[in-house]
Amino acid sequence: MCIGIPMRVVVGSEFIAQCERHGAISSISLMLVGPQAPGTHLLTHLGSAIRVLDADEARAIDDALAGLAEAVEGRAFDMLFADLISREPELPPHLRGE
């Protein structure tokens, strides 16, 4: 399983951006997504941006990763999965058999 990490562009160039997550700065390749402006949210994996995110998507992914960390530590994590609590999961259209 691969895990994508949301990061925010601080300084971008044509092929590389300096991106921030929780105060840590990393150099991220932009070869798959093209040049991005400062403030843009990116989904990253192994030093490469793989998708541009909006702020809500970045926050939801960051919350999910924090929830996993809380679960591993044996702490409460429901508040970090607000989009999933109190609703039935839905199958994607291609699995519904409609």
Swiss-Prot record:
Superkingdom of origin organism: Bacteria
GO molecular function: carbon dioxide binding; iron ion binding
UniProt-listed Gene3D superfamilies: 2.30.30.140
Pfam family, one: HupF_HypC
Disulfide-bonded cysteines: none
GO biological process, one term: protein maturation
Family to which the UniProt record says this protein belongs: Belongs to the HupF/HypC family.
PANTHER family: HYDROGENASE MATURATION FACTOR HYBG (PTHR35177:SF2)
Name of the protein this chain belongs to: Hydrogenase expression/formation protein HupF
Gene: hupF
